[in-house]
Amino acid sequence: MNYYWRWLQGIGFGILMASGATAIQAAEPLPRPLQPLRLSQSYTDLVAVSLFQHYTAGYPAPILTDGLSSREIDSVHLTFVRRLIGEAGDDGSVVGYKVALTNPNAQAQLGVNHPLYGFLLENMLLESGASLPMEFGSRPHAEGDLMVRVGSADINQADTDLELLAALDAVIPFLELPDLIYEPDANVNAGALVAVNVGARYGIVGDPVDLAVDESGLEQLANIRVVLNNARGQFLAEGSSDALLGHPINAVRWLRDTLNSQGVELRPGDLLSLGSVTSLVSLEEGAGIQGIEARYFGLESSERSVDLEVSFEEPEQDS
């Protein structure tokens, strides 16, 4: 157990999950673990606090991370997430991870050649039928996502795709409601995205669907289609699960390998959001979207879709 892990334990990243007490190391979503900062800690704290204030106030933030090293970005990220946990109180347990930038074109736009990850907190995950304020974030969006659940710690030693699959116990429809946070004209790069926990805000979680632990399970994961419609049934976006690094199991492998390289092991019960299946749908002012229905085809053997819904409440007008 390295020094970095002991430091993280000291800042309170112990988490409690339904399956039992679990400790997770928070670390930078890049290939190597980083040591904690000392000389620039106060400055990175100021950046994290400012970004957190924009996040909680729902007001778009400027880019504050230009010129920061990867180590400094890591410190901003951890401080930002620590404040999210504190703000959430009893509902602030870390329950899993969110993978971002699973599309090579999106990676290139942000200047990297790999995905990124952030943390999912319990209070971010909502049931289908939930209602949120229309302005639930600084720059609210929606996208069809896909989630899997870790069923066995064997995932950390799994070699083949089938071994990875066998360590998962469910695939879960997940309508993510991310927050882009930064000002519309901001030049967002990978560091800026990592600093704000890769934009995690809310998501609508469906019921877990069992996965077959053979080739049919891999085929099932590879052939999921997601369609987003607005509350009036009008088409918004669609996509298929091969958008996730070519196959969802590749996104699982990338996250597992990245975490393991940083001394972190996945635990049974961890929820893994694997990335964008559809394109982003803007929910910002003027979009006129009062609700979204996400229809998942191919999750189950029947042709019937698995559907998720969320509605958005208009702000009260001053009289």
Regions inferred by a protein language model and the residue ranges of each:
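Catalytic-core "active-site belt" of small-molecule-metabolizing enzymes
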Residues: L34-H247, E284-E285, E303-E309
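Bacterial N-terminal signal peptides that target proteins for export
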Residues: M1-I11
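Bacterial N-terminal signal peptides
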Residues: Q9-G20
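Short, surface-exposed secondary-structure edge patches
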Residues: I73, Q262-V264
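Boundary at the C-terminal end of the N-terminal hydrophobic targeting segment
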Residues: A23-A27
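Conserved metal-binding segment of the jelly-roll/cupin
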Residues: L266-S279
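Charged, cofactor-coupling segments
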Residues: G144, E285-S319
